[in-house]
Amino acid sequence: MELQPPEASIAVVSIPRQLPGSHSEAGVQGLSAGDDSELGSHCVAQTGLELLASGDPLPSASQNAEMIETGSDCVTQAGLQLLASSDPPALASKNAEVTGTMSQDTEVDMKEVELNELEPEKQPMNAASGAAMSLAGAEKNGLVKIKVAEDEAEAAAAAKFTGLSKEELLKVAGSPGWVRTRWALLLLFWLGWLGMLAGAVVIIVRAPRCRELPAQKWWHTGALYRIGDLQAFQGHGAGNLAGLKGRLDYLSSLKVKGLVLGPIHKNQKDDVAQTDLLQIDPNFGSKEDFDSLLQSAKKKSIRVILDLTPNYRGENSWFSTQVDTVATKVKDALEFWLQAGVDGFQVRDIENLKDASSFLAEWQNITKGFSEDRLLIAGTNSSDLQQILSLLESNKDLLLTSSYLSDSGSTGEHTKSLVTQYLNATGNRWCSWSLSQARLLTSFLPAQLLRLYQLMLFTLPGTPVFSYGDEIGLDAAALPGQPMEAPVMLWDESSFPDIPGAVSANMTVKGQSEDPGSLLSLFRRLSDQRSKERSLLHGDFHAFSAGPGLFSYIRHWDQNERFLVVLNFGDVGLSAGLQASDLPASASLPAKADLLLSTQPGREEGSPLELERLKLEPHEGLLLRFPYAA
């Protein structure tokens, strides 16, 4: 019979002890006859051997248990008979022997019960017939551990591939097939590499060139803010450098880049001897106050430009009879205040200074000799283009403020003519834009055009220059007893405490700061756009026709976002007929542009507007933007 063990099974082979109950009586007789306990045990074992020799079938596990129980009863009965027939001493000795023997036999019998339960699995190694079972020493299967592989996959894994040896690998690598394959792959690699290199070269060659950014100074990046009268700027009962220091946060909110301050030096009206450009008038503060103001302004990225116009309290700003003396004083003052840390200077009314061009050239050399980052501003009341150009010819980096645009009238065509003529005459020179050298916008413009001019000044190529109060539309004519050139700044409704109702909330800084549609809010937005957009910072300028009464132009720089400005100076609504034929290919107009802001309320900002159907309200200005298109 072929042995078929289960997976990972263990075959058990043992020789059990049998205590058949049918032959236990002989053991009892031996005990009752006075034999010792060893004889009784021997009889029980002998009876078991006789049972094995008889050839009877092996009892089952339950029968074995019955036999063991019957045998135990017989042994107990034999013990009782022994007690009845023996003397006490012998009884005690026999009792101890029987008790020990029974304890040992009981322990053995319990183990035999456990072994007999496994009997069906313990068959003879060679059980061809029942006769073989009669042999007392018949061989039975013992405990044999057989380890069987779990499955064929495990057997296959045992014989896994260990790879080629070095000699085998070299032999295969040198075969003709692999040699051809390696050459083919190497050729494909270099062809791919050369293709990518050629593609990169083509992209670089055909890509549009990025324009080099022009060198820019700090005054190129934003507006300048003039405070000619400290007392008027700070209001009644104030007007010193310490008070101005407290207003620097307000100037910072306007996003202005420079503060044009003063004059604040000592000046006796029309007395050159009592005019000291090196000393600060005690009414305004001390040198220490000025130094503190400089440090605080620099922390807020605001540059300080000092006005050194000598006779600012007199009739003639330059003491016409003592020009050389005054020129020497100015020269000394430039060197002194440069050392003190100022960022530039302003001199006004230079049309009253004899040989102004030569003096300006000398002062410019002193300023630039100290640092290229220092600025000189000259102011004139002239609106004549030729006179303005004569002042600019010999002074390359001079920034000039004038009344040139104050004669613009109220038509878009005339304003367009003035701007384009000025830009063409000055060429590549950096310009500045204002309506005067010191006065407010309201001195030249009606209230309905203030927003329009703010938009224009912030978007023309150059530096916009404003006076304090221009951001809120400060109008001296609307205030009782105020001078035209320096009215009191309206911070809140308490600016005129002696005249109740003289100032309304919408006229003040406080009231307009809370109104997103106010002139002040528009000023701040335009100033912010002007300082961060490349096209507005140093972009090209192209004016083009848009229809009667309109002034339109485009600002663009390289591949940056473009800005379109359309201004309606008229008193009626107009339709803009934007003619892109006037523009170069680099400044072509799209069909639509997004509205960035309008000077009039009611338009949805960010909405696309069709340029062919563009309509403007009276005195409305639009700032639109559109992306670069190759």
From Swiss-Prot:
Cytoplasmic side residue ranges read 102-184
Task of the protein? Acts as a chaperone that facilitates biogenesis and trafficking of functional transporters heterodimers to the plasma membrane. Forms heterodimer with SLC7 family transporters (SLC7A5, SLC7A6, SLC7A7, SLC7A8, SLC7A10 and SLC7A11), a group of amino-acid antiporters. Heterodimers function as amino acids exchangers, the specificity of the substrate depending on the SLC7A subunit. Heterodimers SLC3A2/SLC7A6 or SLC3A2/SLC7A7 mediate the uptake of dibasic amino acids. (Microbial infection) In case of hepatitis C virus/HCV infection, the complex formed by SLC3A2 and SLC7A5/LAT1 plays a role in HCV propagation by facilitating viral entry into host cell and increasing L-leucine uptake-mediated mTORC1 signaling activation, thereby contributing to HCV-mediated pathogenesis.
Q: Where is this cross-link: Glycyl lysine isopeptide (Lys-Gly) (interchain with G-Cter in SUMO2)?
A: K166
Q: Does the keyword Phosphoprotein apply?
A: yes
Q: Name one GO biological process term.
A: proline transport
Task: Give the gene symbol.
Answer: SLC3A2
Gene3D superfamilies tied to this protein: Glycosidases, Golgi alpha-mannosidase II
Name what induces it. Expression is induced in resting peripheral blood T-lymphocytes following PHA stimulation. Expression increases at the time of maximal DNA synthesis, in fibroblasts stimulated to divide. Expression and the uptake of leucine is stimulated in mononuclear, cytotrophoblast-like choriocarcinoma cells by combined treatment with PMA and calcium ionophore. Up-regulated in response to hydrogen peroxide. Highly expressed in various cancer types.
User: Mind telling me what this protein is named?
Assistant: Amino acid transporter heavy chain SLC3A2
